[in-house]
């Protein structure tokens, strides 16, 4: 007899949790505060709070020096502490309703550098699957602790964030065993579907009542590039919107082919991922990795300094837990793009904080060992250098056709070796490919609803 799997929300119910059946919604609210491993937490996979408002903040203008607004959607309130749980769930539930991923037959593989792996471990715990997370061996220790805490096995490959290609190679090797199924975030389209529909439409809601209520620019640093899919939906609502992909200056793969090591966990993985729709990426922006950690230190430990800068104390206190290095990277990129595009009063730049500070204590501990002293004047300088003085340098315009062809060629180099055909890769050069994949949401929602009964 087949093992019964706890079924979670449809895509529509992740976007609009108030459309979930009332009894399920009430159980999910209770589970959120009482039992992290209650399967009803699947219904808490949403950008929204209990009253239906998108979890977000307007980054203090006292730190940006801008007339434009920097609106930051907050991923820390998702189950497991990161929005990456959304694509992990979407990929698993699609596989389950298609009959391809079954808990009594298959082990789940989760290639990751951290947050997606945490999400995979968490979803496997809630839905009754055995999970194996494959990730580099030099990430923050909090990541490993969370994954093991959810009961998944860890399989570590050499290196750090920039060495994720080794995790992909290991994952493809393990997939030769028919008992293994990979939630392959870098290559499978549920990741794209979740972020285009759930994140993209939540972003459109997040700016309502702020400035002119529109989005002039969306910035996001790609790891898998799933989050960048939100830009496709943002452009449907606001055709004038620009999409900027951010990456570490030290690993400027998309901009210049750079393949160096860097400190920003979760992004900059030395590839053009398969699910990255480069057609809708307008700019690539390089961010210095050390500035993201300096900015994190300011937001975490510089509350009094921020208040002296004019930031409301309640906001300064709130922001202490809202960011990791990649979130700071996204804010820096948003400031740079606002200046580059010469945005003014009423204009909004929308960006994402993937997770919160809870998994980065060790990152700041390591920082303490690299600096002889972190006196007040040092952090005062960082406020200016990281945020207020973020400039328009290292911004690359990739809107011209020759730039698109360069990125397509890079994607071919990265993915032909993993068995994808040139014909399939060529199909991604047409927006029809992405729209057809997006349109599959309705079919999956119907399947999930039918199986849930």
Where in this protein do the model-derived segments appear?
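PLP-dependent amino-acid enzyme catalytic core
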Residues: 1-453
């Amino acid at each position: 007899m087949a093992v019964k799997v706890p079924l979670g929300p449809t895509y529509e119910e992740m976007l609009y949790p108030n459309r979930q059946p009332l009894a399920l919604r009430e159980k999910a609210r209770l589970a959120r505060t009482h039992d992290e491993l209650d399967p009803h937490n699947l219904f808490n996979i949403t950008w929204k709070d209990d009253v239906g408002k998108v979890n977000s903040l307007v980054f203090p203008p006292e730190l940006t020096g801008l007339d434009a607004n920097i609106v930051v959607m907050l991923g820390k309130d998702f189950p497991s502490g990161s929005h990456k749980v959304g694509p992990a769930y979407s990929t698993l539930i699609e596989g389950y309703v298609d009959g391809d991923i079954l808990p009594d037959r298959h082990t789940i593989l989760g290639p990751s550098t951290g947050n997606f792996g945490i999400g995979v471990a968490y979803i496997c715990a809630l839905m009754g699957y055995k999970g194996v997370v494959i990730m580099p061996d030099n990430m923050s220790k909090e990541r490993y602790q969370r994954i093991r805490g959810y009961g998944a096995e860890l399989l570590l490959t050499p290196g750090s964030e920039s060495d994720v290609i080794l995790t992909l190679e290991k994952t493809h090797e393990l997939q030769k065993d028919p008992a293994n199924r990979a939630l392959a975030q870098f290559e499978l389209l549920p990741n794209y579907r979740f972020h285009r529909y759930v994140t993209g439409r939540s972003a459109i809601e997040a700016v309502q009542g702020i400035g002119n209520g529109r989005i002039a620019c969306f910035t996001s640093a790609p790891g898998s590039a799933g989050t960048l899919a939100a830009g496709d939906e943002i452009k449907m609502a606001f055709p004038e919107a620009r999409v900027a992909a951010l990456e570490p200056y030290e690993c400027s793969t998309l901009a210049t082919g750079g393949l160096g090591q860097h400190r920003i966990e979760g992004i900059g993985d030395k590839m053009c991922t398969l699910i990255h729709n480069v057609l809708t990426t307008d700019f690539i922006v390089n961010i210095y990795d050390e500035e993201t950690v300096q900015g994190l230190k300011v937001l975490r430990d510089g509350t009094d300094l921020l208040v002296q800068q004019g930031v409301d104390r309640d906001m300064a206190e709130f922001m202490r837990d809202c960011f990791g290095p990649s979130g700071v990277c996204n804010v820096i990129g948003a400031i740079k793009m606002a200046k580059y595009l010469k945005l003014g009063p009423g204009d909004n730049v929308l960006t994402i904080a993937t997770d919160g500070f809870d998994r980065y204590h060790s990152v700041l501990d390591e920082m303490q060992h690299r600096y002889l002293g972190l006196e007040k004047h040092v952090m005062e300088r960082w406020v200016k250098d990281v945020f207020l003085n973020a400039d328009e340098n290292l911004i690359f315009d990739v809107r011209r056709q020759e730039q698109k062809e360069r990125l397509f060629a890079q994607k071919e180099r990265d993915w032909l070796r993993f068995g994808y055909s040139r014909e399939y890769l060529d199909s991604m050069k047409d927006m029809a490919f992405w729209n057809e994949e997006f349109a599959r949401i309705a079919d999956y929602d119907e399947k999930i609803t039918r199986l849930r009964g």
